[in-house]
């Protein structure tokens, strides 16, 4: 059993990465299908979810929302039933393996709800009889980059999380999150399509003419577009990008394009409102009162106010003064939303804009010196599976990882309460100096994370944080 590769899972609110260690990328990236539950926001941080769809209709540019059902949390029995089917699909349909022969490495969100973790452990041990479960927090994403200091910006489906890591230690007091992600882009795209569906955005592919028949347009909208999140995601991925002004401080005009949704019809994607303007929802302006407020504690009262840039700056405000510049030099992007074209440059421009916007703002008073120091950690891997790769590397040195549970210890626990105590809490996973030691040991023996690409593209010009380049294999 020890000779078999471990299974590495990263369960996200929208997609799940699954594969084997010590491979450099997941075998499959599949939708997190926990039907009949729809709990993407719940998986992000324990937020309530609505198990019923909200039907949105459009009538002469008037959008109304019907069927408002109070939100509720899932029960443990519901989670176990959905997780059993979900893991069965992973083991039998994708990874093609026996669950009782493979150790499971779970790369988890640091604030994954405990009820979900308990249900997941119960299903894997009691029904699938896996021999070992190891919990790895997202700070393992530093290991493929050979760094010990980074400002983690994880922008996923339903929220963006910012966590600073300084010399291997997570600064949890500075952790911030905001409900902005690819779901925000999808909702914005839906609103645009609903309000403009009869304004000639549906194109007939045969004669390349706009269709104004409201019955045909609404039928296409409800049957083919709004009910397909994959199609909306594909529109955003293929057509949209993060825009910025040119050197003359003028907006760049973007051409409209046609997106083919079927053999007969296409959608006219507006260049200004959608292609370059859709991403603006991630950087929506905050109230001036928030910018003029010099009380740092007010940032904790309402995390929903602001945008991605202000969330990052609020995180830096919570860090010590000598930590801010090293963190700014080592920004590490995670999540699929950060893979949009132009995301890095737009993020830096928005950070600079917030620092220059108001002379009396707390950002300008305390963080103005960071202008010109926002740099990203360069690496040859994709942002959406970097955390998974960190778990894949750590799977080769499980004897050094303490956040693990064996099947024997779980089944021998005298009560359900004792079993739940075996599951590690997030506050016990904050110090990742252990991960650094594992990386040093691992890179000199079994796996080099750079063996899949050249080392020249890995390190940023700033080396204000420790790197582990001396531990690379020399041969």
From Swiss-Prot:
Please verify whether the record's keywords include Cytoplasm. yes
For this protein, the record's SUPFAM superfamilies field holds:
Actin-like ATPase domain (SSF53067)
Subcellular localization is given as:
Cytoplasm, Cytoskeleton
Gene Ontology cellular component annotations, sorted alphabetically: cytoplasm; dynactin complex
Q: Which UniProt keywords apply?
A: Cytoplasm, Cytoskeleton
Q: Which Pfam families match?
A: Actin
Q: Main subcellular localization, coarse class?
A: cytoplasm
InterPro entries for this protein: Actin (IPR004000), ATPase_NBD (IPR043129)
Can you supply a Gene Ontology BP term from the record? microtubule-based movement
The UniProt family comment states: Belongs to the actin family.
Q: In its UniProt entry, what is this protein called? A: Actin-related protein 10
Q: Which organism is it from?
A: Dictyostelium discoideum (Social amoeba)
Q: Which gene encodes it?
A: arpH
């Amino acid at each position: 059993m020890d000779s078999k590769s471990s299974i590495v899972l990263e369960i996200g609110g929208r997609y799940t990465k699954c594969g084997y260690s010590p491979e450099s990328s997941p075998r499959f990236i599949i939708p997190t299908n926990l039907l009949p539950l729809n709990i993407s926001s719940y998986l992000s941080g324990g937020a309530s979810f609505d198990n019923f769809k909200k039907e949105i209709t459009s009538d002469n540019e008037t959008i109304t929302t019907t069927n408002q059902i109070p939100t509720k949390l899932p029960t443990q029995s519901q989670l176990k039933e959905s997780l059993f089917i979900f893991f069965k699909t992973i083991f039998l349909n994708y990874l093609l393996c026996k669950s009782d022969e493979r150790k499971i490495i779970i790369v988890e969100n640091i604030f994954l709800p405990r009820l979900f973790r308990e249900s997941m452990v119960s299903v894997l041990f009691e029904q699938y009889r896996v021999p070992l479960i190891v919990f790895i927090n997202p700070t393992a994403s530093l290991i493929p980059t050979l760094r010990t200091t980074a400002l983690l910006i994880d922008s996923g489906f339903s929220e963006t999380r910012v966590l600073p890591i300084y010399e291997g230690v997570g600064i949890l007091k500075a952790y911030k999150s905001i409900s902005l992600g690819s779901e925000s882009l999808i909702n914005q795209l839906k609103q645009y399509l609903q309000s403009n569906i009869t304004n000639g955005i549906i194109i007939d592919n045969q004669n390349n003419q706009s269709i104004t028949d409201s019955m045909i347009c609404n039928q296409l909208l409800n049957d083919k577009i709004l009910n397909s999140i994959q199609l909306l995601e594909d529109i955003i991925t293929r057509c949209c990008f993060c825009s910025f002004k040119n050197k003359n401080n003028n907006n760049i005009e973007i051409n409209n394009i046609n997106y083919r949704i079927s053999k007969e019809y296409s959608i006219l994607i507006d260049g200004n409102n959608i292609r370059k303007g859709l991403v603006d929802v991630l950087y929506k302006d905050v109230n001036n009162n928030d910018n003029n407020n010099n009380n740092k504690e007010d940032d904790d009262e309402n995390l929903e106010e602001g945008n991605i840039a202000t969330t990052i700056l609020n995180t830096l405000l919570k860090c010590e003064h000598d930590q801010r510049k090293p963190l700014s030099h080592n920004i590490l992007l995670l999540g699929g939303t950060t893979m949009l074209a132009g995301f890095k440059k737009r993020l830096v421009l928005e950070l600079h804009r917030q620092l220059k916007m108001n002379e009396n703002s707390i950002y300008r008073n305390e963080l103005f010196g960071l202008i010109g120091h926002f740099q990203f950690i360069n690496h040859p891997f994709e942002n959406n599976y970097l955390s998974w790769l960190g778990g894949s590397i750590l799977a080769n040195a499980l004897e050094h990882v303490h956040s693990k549970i064996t099947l024997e210890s779980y089944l021998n626990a005298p009560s359900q309460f004792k079993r739940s105590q075996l599951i590690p809490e997030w506050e016990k996973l904050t110090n990742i100096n252990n991960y650094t030691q594992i990386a040093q040991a691992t890179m000199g023996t079994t796996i080099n994370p750079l063996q899949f690409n050249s080392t020249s593209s890995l390190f940023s010009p700033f080396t204000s944080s420790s790197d582990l380049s001396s531990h690379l294999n020399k041969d």
